[in-house]
Amino acid sequence: MKKLVLAYSGGLDTSYCAVHLSKDKGFEVHAVSVNTGGFTESEIEEIETNAYKMGVSTYKNIDAIAIFYSKVVKFLIFGNVLKNNTYPLSVSAERIIQAIEIIEYAKSINAEYIAHGSTGAGNDQVRFDMIFQTLAPDIKIITPIRDEKLSRQQEID
């Protein structure tokens, strides 16, 4: 069976990917989420429960809070880099940390494929793809939501 790591948040897009890739496409799906400080323990447990309901073979949560702070957040605070003069401009950098952690995990389990649920809109897809291609050019990227141009309703159905 083809081993695939799925960047998994537990939302609609990544839940669709888990079902589609495991049941329809026959991948051995290993779901992984990266906590950079946005999840509580109970939320991580919910994400894990949902991942298994969606048919994944394994689920792993990577705690990257300390890495995110030491490599990103503290510099945003030091530089007073704010979005709309309100909060640290951290989301784009957060995706980079998440992508690095996910691809390193994929390499550690010898995955042949990696997938994410980003749509064709926005920059998250670029951040994930760029890091994945740079750090593991031999691992094939699969993006069902973007490639199949699915609507939210199609994902639910």
Per-segment meaning from a language model:
Residues 1-156:
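ATP-dependent adenylation/nucleotidyltransferase module used to activate substrates
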